[in-house]
From Swiss-Prot:
InterPro entries: Metallo-B-lactamas, PQQ_synth_PqqB, RibonucZ/Hydroxyglut_hydro. This is Coenzyme PQQ synthesis protein B. It holds the Pfam family Lactamase_B_2. The lineage of its organism: Bacteria, Pseudomonadati, Pseudomonadota, Gammaproteobacteria, Pseudomonadales. The keyword Lipoprotein does not apply. NCBIfam families: PQQ_syn_pqqB (TIGR02108). Keywords: PQQ biosynthesis, Transport. Disulfide bonds: none annotated. It comes from Pseudomonas aeruginosa (strain ATCC 15692 / DSM 22644 / CIP 104116 / JCM 14847 / LMG 12228 / 1C / PRS 101 / PAO1). Pathway: Cofactor biosynthesis; pyrroloquinoline quinone biosynthesis. The keyword Transport applies. May be involved in the transport of PQQ or its precursor to the periplasm. GO terms for biological process: pyrroloquinoline quinone biosynthetic process. Belongs to the PqqB family.
Length: 304
């Protein structure tokens, strides 16, 4: 299984266009040892030729340009993207569908709750129906059974409902439903390698830990270092848990969770611009390094 990190930042990217926190200011003027990042999205493949896009970032055009495998140029109009999987209906995970309209129709796999949000609150499905057939919904069930996507037939996907939050525009924001957010457990039938992918993760219970323990690689929510980070940095008024993100530090935080899991690789993705782990010289980054936890970067390639 080929895993390409197209974008590794949280919503707004890094640096965020209107943010002057220490990290954003520092990456602009060179005073912080960090590299810019686009908004989170990954691509998966079983053969390195046909790819499945997991979430469609607002930065998708630049991400495709930075990864030539997604543009094989076999004909006047071409793409190696064979399907799209949406793990939620967040703006920073779905807006890229608008930039992909010239390639419609697209097979879009998502839960019923995500499809509802993208048909009513943020109506991408009806809007894009005017472009060559638009988005063809392929429902993702929450029954725990693995499913295949024809674009990459040697991969098996299992959707795992997560405890997180629907986007602010959703009619049921603050009223969680199964399917608002999912994680993916992806297995390669040939190599037997397994990935657990959850860029938006608010809580981890024992059932979810069992899925994580089965994976060779964890690619999980790295949004915030501390739960009150947005308040401390004076850039927001919400705690991480209110936004559906489990902070890395503190009791029950992501670092404690990952210490319980034997995966060969543990990688944080969807990293907010305020998070000190973006600074490679920070004490927080050193703590991750000592724990064997990696920080995803745009262009990172993992093979299982």
């Amino acid at each position: 299984m080929h895993i390409r990190i197209l974008g590794s930042a949280a919503g707004g990217g890094f640096p965020q266009w209107n943010c002057n926190c220490r990290n954003c200011r520092g990456v602009r003027d060179g005073s912080v040892a960090a590299q810019p990042r686009t908004q989170s999205s990954i691509a998966l493949s079983d053969d390195g030729e046909r790819w499945i896009l997991c979430n469609a970032s607002p930065d998708i055009r630049a991400q495709i340009a930075a990864f030539p495998a997604l543009q094989p140029a076999r004909r006047p109009r071409d793409t190696a993207i064979g399907a799209i999987v949406l793990l939620d209906s967040q703006i920073d995970h779905t807006t890229g569908l608008l930039s992909l309209r010239e390639g419609c129709p697209h097979e879009v796999w998502c839960t019923q709750m995500v499809h509802q949000d993208l048909s009513e609150g943020f109506p991408l499905f009806p809007m894009l129906s005017h472009w060559n057939g638009g988005l063809r919904h392929r429902p993702i069930a929450l029954d725990g059974e693995p499913f295949a996507i024809p674009a990459c037939p040697r991969l098996r996907f299992t959707a795992i409902p997560l405890r997180s939050s629907a986007p602010p525009y959703s009619p049921h924001r603050g009223d969680p439903h199964p399917g608002d957010n999912i994680g993916l457990f992806v297995e390669d039938l040939d190599s037997a390698g397994a990935l657990f992918y959850a860029p938006g993760l608010g809580e981890v219970d024992e059932a979810l830990l069992e899925w994580m323990r089965r994976a060779d690689c964890l690619l999980v929510d790295g949004t915030l270092w501390r739960d009150d980070e947005m308040l401390v940095c004076e850039v927001g008024d919400k705690l991480g848990r209110q936004m559906g993100h489990l902070a890395q530090s503190g009791p029950g935080g992501m670092l404690e969770v990952l210490a319980k899991v034997p995966a060969a690789r543990k990688v944080l993705i969807h990293i907010n611009n305020t998070n000190p782990i973006l600074d490679t010289a920070s004490a927080e980054r050193a703590e991750l390094d000592a724990s064997g936890i990696e920080v995803a970067w745009d262009g990172m390639h993992i093979q299982l």
